[in-house]
């Protein structure tokens, strides 16, 4: 984790140090912001490590309600960025409630199953009613996220929910049904015009950036060029031609992996992916060694969340 924090900070700094349009003339602006975010994250992480996960179980309903309130507030008074009303400004910090909702959904689903199988119900296995309950827990935040609309977060949440349902031991036909429903729902959404035009364009550009390299496919095309520039060993930190020129939009956020690809090359990118893999492996190990069902489902769900989000981000950059 320490390696990811250090490497991520350097990549963010490299992506922004030459971008006066982002930094307002202070080359270290995003470096400072990243360090503040890391400090907050480390403090919260230490607090969570020092807390028995059974307390998390007790607080799960409160966390869930708070996340739903946050999602409602962002629809009412949030800031719109890139077509999605997803951010709240709190004390000078920008907060994305949907990120907290992912955690809330995971521990909420874990609590439901644990209470049904280990609590007063004393079931031996997860039943159909339990799966429906998990889907209801996930459904409310999902609807609020779609209203923003934030399709990327919705995909991560859907994959996470699918993972928790699978880990819970739900009947296999539920997994098949959920997968089929997701595919069918996506097709219907496209055909019925539920998705915004720019969302459809982004998907088409992801599948084939060459269709519109100057329009919808521009981001993905520039990302692929940056990664291709890196070769095996990269152009060197702070030396990437695409990065220094600012050709890759949102490079300090959604396309941060392109900085690694261009400046650290195949070798550096492989190291970054390996570090992500170590974190994922540790999360899965914690899930497998948890001494109760709630802990196993919560850790497993967080592993699914982290793993799919990393896969989505790297895959989006690679095109």
Enumerate the language-model features and the residues they cover.
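Extracytosolic (periplasmic/ER-lumenal) interhelical loops and adjacent juxtamembrane/interface segments
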Residues: 215-238, 242
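Long extracytoplasmic/lumenal interhelical loops at the membrane interface
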Residues: 232-267, 290
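Short, small-residue-rich loop/turn micro-motifs
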Residues: 15-16, 227, 231, 318
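Hydrophobic alpha-helical transmembrane segments of multi-pass inner membrane proteins, especially
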Residues: 2-14, 20-219, 258-317
């Amino acid at each position: 984790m320490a390696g990811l924090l250090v490497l991520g900070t350097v990549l963010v700094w490299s992506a922004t140090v030459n971008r006066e349009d982002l930094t307002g003339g202070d080359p270290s602006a995003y470096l400072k912001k990243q360090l503040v975010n890391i400090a907050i994250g480390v403090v919260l992480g230490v607090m969570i490590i020092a807390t028995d996960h059974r307390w998390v179980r007790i607080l799960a309903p409160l966390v869930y309600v708070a996340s739903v309130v946050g999602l409602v507030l962002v629809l009412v008074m949030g800031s719109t960025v890139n077509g999605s009303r997803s951010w709240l400004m709190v004390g000078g910090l920008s907060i994305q409630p949907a990120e907290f909702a992912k955690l809330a959904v995971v521990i909420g689903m874990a609590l439901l199953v644990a209470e049904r199988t280990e609590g007063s119900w004393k079931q031996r296995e997860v039943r159909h009613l339990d799966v429906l309950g998990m889907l209801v827990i996930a459904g409310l935040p999902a609807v609020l996220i779609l209203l923003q609309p934030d399709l990327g977060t919705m995909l991560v949440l859907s994959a996470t929910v699918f993972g928790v349902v699978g880990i819970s031991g739900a009947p296999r036909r539920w997994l098949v049904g959920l997968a089929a429903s997701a595919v069918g729902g996506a097709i219907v959404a496209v055909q019925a015009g539920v998705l915004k035009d720019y969302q459809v364009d982004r998907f088409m550009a992801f599948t084939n950036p060459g269709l519109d390299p100057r329009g919808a496919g521009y981001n993905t095309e520039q990302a692929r060029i940056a990664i291709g520039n890196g070769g095996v060993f990269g152009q060197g930190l702070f030396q990437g031609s695409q990065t220094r020129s600012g050709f890759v939009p949102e490079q300090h956020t959604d396309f941060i992996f392109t900085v690694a690809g261009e400046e650290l090359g195949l070798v550096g990118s492989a190291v970054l992916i390996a570090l992500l893999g170590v974190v994922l492996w540790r999360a899965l190990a914690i899930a497998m060694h948890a001494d109760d069902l709630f802990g196993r489902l919560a850790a497993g769900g967080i592993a699914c969340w982290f793993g799919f989000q990393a896969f989505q981000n790297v895959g989006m950059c690679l095109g």
